[in-house]
Amino acid sequence: MAAKDVQFGNEVRQKMVNGVNILANAVRVTLGPKGRNVVLDRAFGGPHITKDGVSVAKEIELKDKFENMGAQMVKEVASKTNDVAGDGTTTATVLAQSIVAEGMKYVTAGMNPTDLKRGIDKAVAALVDELKNIAKPCDTSKEIAQVGSISANSDEQVGAIIAEAMEKVGKEGVITVEDGKSLENELDVVEGMQFDRGYLSPYFINDAEKQIAGLDNPFVLLFDKKISNIRDLLPVLEQVAKASRPLLIIAEDVEGEALATLVVNNIRGILKTVAVKAPGFGDRRKAMLQDIAILTGGVVISEEVGLSLEKATLDDLGQAKRIEIGKENTTIIDGFGDAAQIEARVAEIRQQIETATSDYGKEKLQERVAKLAGGVAVIKVGAATEVEMKEKKDRVEDALHATRAAVEEGVVAGGGVALLRARAALENLHTGNADQEAGVQIVLRAVESPLRQIVAKAGGEPSVVVNKVLEGKGNYGYKAGSGEYGDMIEMGVLDPAKVTRSALQHAASIAGLMLTTDCMIAEIPERKPAMPDMGGMGGMGGMM
């Protein structure tokens, strides 16, 4: 086991604070409408330019072990805020730096760090309650667009495209961000349920121009095993042929004689059918087949529930208004499923999301909810160069997270104003002793720090602006983008309440732990001896 370097007291705390300041100063330059970019070196490819706080924080590793511990703890603030709210990482870092800086003054003066932390925790709890009280719902497309614009560095086009996407697929719909092919941002919306499986044979295509197989008013047969024998399918095919309607077969696979017969029938015009593989694998495949069954009003024909293919009837089949099958995707539009059953299925999947442990599992469950509840929208980010594309994608993703948070918990006045107004909750806060009261004072001063940083980056005088904003009431604040004062919500400067709340809670949590630290332990790196000189190698004539 390697030897350890153990350090105590003010000296090591100062090193930790140095680490906090190095990371926070790198992150804070990105805050506000006039915040600057940070350029990140990459081992492969060109540099990455970003205004995303958490991306900057994740890049920072310091040489000094004790300074690095301080930096990593603040990095945790940014990461946690990003995980919970998806935005507000720079605000969280600025708040953490301020609480640590103010708190260290009191610790150095001899106050009890544990009581200081208790005071900080009480103040933050009161502020969070007040933020919830002053938050207003974010319902309209205009408000959603404003939240998106602010988060995307005052880019109104980004806000507008996110608002349009939410309007089209609903607030539960899946919105993804991808690289575009042009210079402009584009929005692609897939109505209905789409899954990533296409036709099993190109002979099923009936729209040569679009290269798709389109089925109007079709039946949908769902089977959880392979189909290779046409005899198993004949009873169902005969019933569908009598009804004079097309048929989509979704099964684990359709192969051999069964696939050949379906193709021949399709070409001859006897029965319009298309076969596709079921989406997903294993248990996820079963779950997705069940989703499709509920959406189309059919059942999954499975031996597990005592149903067989030979005995299937038209009542077991799902139905839809239209289904389009491409080479790689199938889209079901207007399934005939019962609305109450679809809602119940969505509620069931939402419960699974709450108990899911992996991010991948959660993401897949959320996709299933979206496909049942609304649809899927793809925002294609356009840019002239790859470096600009990455930077724009970062901003669009931040804006998307911010708008989701706004819809969830409402919005408050932006530009650091909400935190200043929430200070009113601390006026009547009773603490146990003078040290806890000092903890409350630390938070009172810290909540000014986001506004101070925004003003400083805009070239203003922070103290003058903070005092003028404090003289006002309600949503009165300073719009740094234009340098004017007024009602922040009317001027379209909104922050999601969830983002502001998460930033404050995570900043106070880590900062409080730092203040109560009195000892730090780091590994002493072993000095390995240099490799011996190779000298002249045999037969090489002494090349050294």
Swiss-Prot record:
<dbReference type="InterPro" id="IPR027413">
    <property type="entry name" value="GROEL-like_equatorial_sf"/>
</dbReference>
<dbReference type="InterPro" id="IPR001844">
    <property type="entry name" value="Cpn60/GroEL"/>
</dbReference>
<feature type="binding site">
    <location>
        <position position="51"/>
    </location>
    <ligand>
        <name>ATP</name>
    </ligand>
</feature>
<feature type="binding site">
    <location>
        <begin position="30"/>
        <end position="33"/>
    </location>
    <ligand>
        <name>ATP</name>
    </ligand>
</feature>
<dbReference type="Pfam" id="PF00118">
    <property type="entry name" value="Cpn60_TCP1"/>
</dbReference>
<comment type="function">
    <text>Together with its co-chaperonin GroES, plays an essential role in assisting protein folding. The GroEL-GroES system forms a nano-cage that allows encapsulation of the non-native substrate proteins and provides a physical environment optimized to promote and accelerate protein folding.</text>
</comment>
<feature type="binding site">
    <location>
        <position position="415"/>
    </location>
    <ligand>
        <name>ATP</name>
    </ligand>
</feature>
<keyword id="KW-0963">Cytoplasm</keyword>
<dbReference type="InterPro" id="IPR027410">
    <property type="entry name" value="TCP-1-like_intermed_sf"/>
</dbReference>
<dbReference type="GO" id="GO:0005737">
    <property type="term" value="C:cytoplasm"/>
</dbReference>
<dbReference type="GO" id="GO:0051082">
    <property type="term" value="F:unfolded protein binding"/>
</dbReference>
<dbReference type="GO" id="GO:0016853">
    <property type="term" value="F:isomerase activity"/>
</dbReference>
<keyword id="KW-0143">Chaperone</keyword>
<comment type="similarity">
    <text>Belongs to the chaperonin (HSP60) family.</text>
</comment>
<keyword id="KW-0413">Isomerase</keyword>
<protein>
    <recommendedName>
        <fullName>Chaperonin GroEL</fullName>
        <ecNumber>5.6.1.7</ecNumber>
    </recommendedName>
</protein>
<dbReference type="InterPro" id="IPR027409">
    <property type="entry name" value="GroEL-like_apical_dom_sf"/>
</dbReference>
<dbReference type="GO" id="GO:0042026">
    <property type="term" value="P:protein refolding"/>
</dbReference>
<dbReference type="GO" id="GO:0005524">
    <property type="term" value="F:ATP binding"/>
</dbReference>
<dbReference type="InterPro" id="IPR018370">
    <property type="entry name" value="Chaperonin_Cpn60_CS"/>
</dbReference>
<dbReference type="InterPro" id="IPR002423">
    <property type="entry name" value="Cpn60/GroEL/TCP-1"/>
</dbReference>
<keyword id="KW-0547">Nucleotide-binding</keyword>
<keyword id="KW-0067">ATP-binding</keyword>
<dbReference type="GO" id="GO:0140662">
    <property type="term" value="F:ATP-dependent protein folding chaperone"/>
</dbReference>
<comment type="subunit">
    <text>Forms a cylinder of 14 subunits composed of two heptameric rings stacked back-to-back. Interacts with the co-chaperonin GroES.</text>
</comment>
<feature type="binding site">
    <location>
        <position position="495"/>
    </location>
    <ligand>
        <name>ATP</name>
    </ligand>
</feature>
<feature type="binding site">
    <location>
        <begin position="87"/>
        <end position="91"/>
    </location>
    <ligand>
        <name>ATP</name>
    </ligand>
</feature>
